[in-house]
Amino acid sequence: ERGTITCLMGRNGSGKSSLMWAIQGATKSSGRVLVNHEGSWADPRKADAATARRMVSLVPQSASDLLYLPTVAEECAQADKESGVPAGTTRAILSRLRVELPEDRNPRDMSEGQRLALVLAIQLSSRPDVVLLDEPTRGLDYAMKTELTRIVKGIAAGATGDPAAVLLATHDVEFAATTTDRTIVMATGHIVADGSTRSVCTSSPGFSPQIAKVFHPADVMTIADVERLVNTPAAVSYTHLTLPTKA
């Protein structure tokens, strides 16, 4: 659903990436994939290339694999051409993402986070209905993960165009807790859990953020939750720590 961010979790080999590539249409698969495109349901795997690009865009685990031109400007211009949009569209998306990249910069000379932002802008140039992100936090530090949370929420909300449905696969439970609305857990190609990210992660020790384990049994998943807890009027004591009473 547009405006939502859903997380796919599961151990290696559970089928997360395979599902994403099947949705995108790059791999043969059985069953049906239906995307609500321009008011009707359609299978992106059966659409022509231009229509499929407007339905689903995928950012793979190694986002830099999609970058092959020598400058940011050329990458943006090529994306505009392939998406059939006015010149400058991809560059404008970068600006809306609040990411400033010199036009003459070679993508190979950029940080992992900068390359990811460029690939996101390229994939968003077609204004897709669904955006797929496969392990987007790989190689990112805490500050960039925080920035990525802002970017992903903006994509879902329509900050870069029309609101999109975002589906991301990750092992990063802290990122999932701060970024996603819903979490689906997969095992050997099957769904074994599906619900709000908070309920799924707190009910499964294997997918619970470290911060939730430290503050158990309090309902804590994120740093923001900790700040709210610390600022409550009464002191809260646990086996691991004591939070001070607010004066």
Language-model features: locations:
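ABC ATPase nucleotide-binding domains
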Residues: 1, 207-241
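ABC ATPase NBD Q-loop/coupling interface
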Residues: 34-51
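Conserved ABC ATPase "signature" region
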Residues: 85-102
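Walker B catalytic motif
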Residues: 106, 135-136
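H-loop/switch region of ABC-family ATPase nucleotide-binding domains
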Residues: 170-171
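A short, surface-exposed alpha-helical micro-motif characterized by mixed small hydrophobic
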Residues: 176-178
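Conserved beta-strand-loop-alpha-helix hinge in the C-terminal portion
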Residues: 190-214
